[in-house]
C-alpha cells in the first residue's frame, strides 16, 4: 500500500493546511447608517491585514465606533470619511448606488443590501457604475461581467489601494514561502507525475506520464481520487487539467 497522498493529508486539517485566521485583523463590512443620516469618521491609521491583498484603514467615527474599512487609493491619515446618502463623491466615502453618478469607479460593492460588500475588494480593482434605473443599477465588475443590483446596495468610491502588487516579482523562493504560509497554502506543490510510485497514483516510470487514464469516478476511494474527477469530457476542447 502506498503512502497517503497530499489530498488525504489535507483532509486531516492540520496547521499546515489551515489558514492562520487568528492573525486576520477583522471581517470588513460597510457601517450601516440611518436612512437619511450621514456619518463622519476620521482615518487614524492605515494597516496591513494578512487576510487580504489590500491595505485597510482604521476609522474612528463620530458616534464612538472604531472599525477597519477597505482602503481605496488616495486616502491619507487625518482625512475624514463619510457614509450615507448625502456623502460627498470622493474616494473613501460610502454611498448607496442610487446616489453615485454613472461612470464613477466603485469598490467593495454589496451584492445584497446590508451584506457588507462582496465585489471589487482585491488590490487595484474597481467596478464601473454603468446605468441607473428606478429599480436596478447595472455595474461592470473587473472581470467584465455585468451585475444588476438593488439601488440601495452600498459601495465605496474609488479604486482599491495596492494596485500593481502582482507586477513585482518574488525573486526569491523564501518570499513566495512567506506569502503562501500567510494564507495557509501548502507550497511548493509537487506534480504527481514527478513523484515516486509509492507517493502518488501517477508517480513512477522511466518518464513523467500518468501511466493510466486520468478520469476517475466521483465515488473513487481516497488515495485514488486524483486527476480529472468525474469529468464529462477531457482532451482538446475539454476541461481536463494538465496535471
Curated annotation (Swiss-Prot):
* Signal sequence, renumbered to the chain: none
Q: Where is the composition biased (Basic and acidic residues)?
A: 24-34, 221-231
GO biological process assignments? cytoplasmic translation
Q: Name one GO cellular component term.
A: cytosolic large ribosomal subunit
Where is the region Disordered?
1-38, 198-243
Q: Where is the composition biased (Basic residues)?
A: 1-12
What's this chain's function? One of the primary rRNA binding proteins. Required for association of the 30S and 50S subunits to form the 70S ribosome, for tRNA binding and peptide bond formation. It has been suggested to have peptidyltransferase activity; this is somewhat controversial. Makes several contacts with the 16S rRNA in the 70S ribosome.
NCBIfam families for the chain: PRK09612.1
State the HAMAP family in the record. Ribosomal_uL2_A (MF_01320_A)
The entry sums up its family as follows: Belongs to the universal ribosomal protein uL2 family.
Subunit-level organization: Part of the 50S ribosomal subunit. Forms a bridge to the 30S subunit in the 70S ribosome.
- What's the name of the protein? Large ribosomal subunit protein uL2
Amino acid at each position: 500500500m502506498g503512502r497517503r497522498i497530499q489530498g488525504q493529508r489535507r483532509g486531516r486539517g492540520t496547521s499546515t493546511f489551515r489558514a492562520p485566521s487568528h492573525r486576520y485583523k477583522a471581517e470588513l463590512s460597510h457601517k450601516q447608517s440611518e436612512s437619511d443620516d450621514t456619518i463622519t469618521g476620521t482615518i487614524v491609521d492605515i494597516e496591513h491585514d494578512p487576510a487580504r491583498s489590500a491595505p485597510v484603514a482604521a476609522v474612528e467615527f463620530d458616534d464612538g465606533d472604531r472599525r477597519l474599512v477597505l482602503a481605496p487609493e488616495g486616502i491619507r491619515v487625518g482625512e475624514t470619511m463619510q457614509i450615507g446618502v448625502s456623502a460627498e463623491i470622493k474616494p473613501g466615502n460610502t454611498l448607496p448606488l442610487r446616489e453615485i453618478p454613472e461612470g464613477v469607479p466603485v469598490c467593495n460593492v454589496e451584492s445584497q443590501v446590508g451584506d457588507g460588500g462582496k465585489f471589487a475588494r482585491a488590490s487595484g480593482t474597481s467596478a464601473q457604475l454603468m446605468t441607473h434605473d428606478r429599480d436596478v443599477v447595472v455595474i461592470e465588475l473587473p472581470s467584465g461581467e455585468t451585475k444588476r443590483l438593488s439601488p440601495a446596495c452600498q459601495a465605496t468610491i474609488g479604486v482599491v489601494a495596492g494596485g500593481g502588487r502582482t507586477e513585482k516579482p518574488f525573486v526569491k523562493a523564501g518570499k513566495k514561502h512567506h506569502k503562501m504560509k500567510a494564507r495557509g497554502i501548502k507550497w511548493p506543490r509537487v506534480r504527481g507525475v514527478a513523484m515516486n510510485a509509492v507517493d502518488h497514483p501517477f508517480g513512477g516510470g522511466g518518464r513523467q506520464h500518468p501511466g493510466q487514464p486520468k478520469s476517475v469516478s466521483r465515488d473513487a476511494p481516497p488515495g485514488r481520487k486524483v486527476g480529472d474527477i468525474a469529468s464529462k469530457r477531457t482532451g482538446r476542447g475539454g476541461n481536463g487539467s494538465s496535471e
